[in-house]
Swiss-Prot record:
Extracellular side: 42-55, 108-126, 193-194
Protein localization: Cell membrane
Listed name of the protein: Cytochrome bo(3) ubiquinol oxidase subunit 3
Originating organism: Buchnera aphidicola subsp. Baizongia pistaciae (strain Bp)
Membrane topology: Multi-pass membrane protein
Gene name in the database record: cyoC
Source lineage: Bacteria, Pseudomonadati, Pseudomonadota, Gammaproteobacteria, Enterobacterales
Pfam families: COX3
């Protein structure tokens, strides 16, 4: 006889407290990196500033990729509640592909800037810019690895409370990365273009 279970959807449950604390520590890291960036933004050492190097089209595409991946990541939880395995795999795959495209565009931007001679050693501004964007990119890559692990878990164990809980943590992490990206987009790229 198949065991019935009810999925707990409370994002403020005591089981998630540790993960919320982790997200807060990540938030402190990004706040520190933003502070360093804002302190060094005018230290261009006779090199380029943001309005000289930022590419509007690339940044907008990156933003849409990450925002759409957040939407698709949310649909994974919805389909888990409905116990629709096919759609869970589909939305996890779409989230993974969108995140992977985002990372490729970030790497393209980095290599493009370095090829132009605007690497992280050029100025304080570029150092802080590269560290902030690379830290976000490393977090996105970590999220992509987590998505692969979740695909394996769901494939192996089906949908259980533990799998749902892990997916909920991934979802919170992915949304956190989106929020950080919105800040990067707004305060680094948009203000940097002015």
């Amino acid at each position: 006889m198949k065991k019935k279970y009810k999925i707990d959807t409370n994002i403020f449950s005591k089981e998630l407290l540790g993960f919320w604390l982790y997200l807060m520590s990540d938030c402190i890291i990004f706040c520190t990196l933003f502070s360093v960036y804002f302190i060094l933004v005018d230290n261009v050492a006779q090199g380029p500033s943001g309005h000289n190097i930022f590419q509007n089209n690339l940044i907008i595409i990156e933003t849409f990729l990450l925002l759409f991946s957040s939407f698709s990541c949310n649909l994974v939880l919805f389909e888990m509640k409905n116990k629709n395995l096919y759609m869970v795999f589909l939305w996890l795959g779409i989230t993974f592909l969108l995140g992977l495209l985002f990372v490729f565009l970030e790497l393209f931007e980095f290599f493009h800037l370095i090829n132009l001679g605007f690497g992280p050693t050029r100025s304080g501004f570029l150092s802080s810019f590269f560290v902030l964007i690379a830290t976000h990119g490393i977090h996105v890559i970590s999220g992509l690895i987590w998505i692969i692990v979740m695909i394996k878990y769901v494939y192996t164990f089906n949908i259980t409370n533990l799998i749902y809980y892990r997916m909920l943590c991934l979802n919170l992490f992915w949304h956190f990365l989106d929020i950080v990206w919105v800040f990067i987009f707004s305060f680094v790229y948009l203000f940097g273009m002015v």
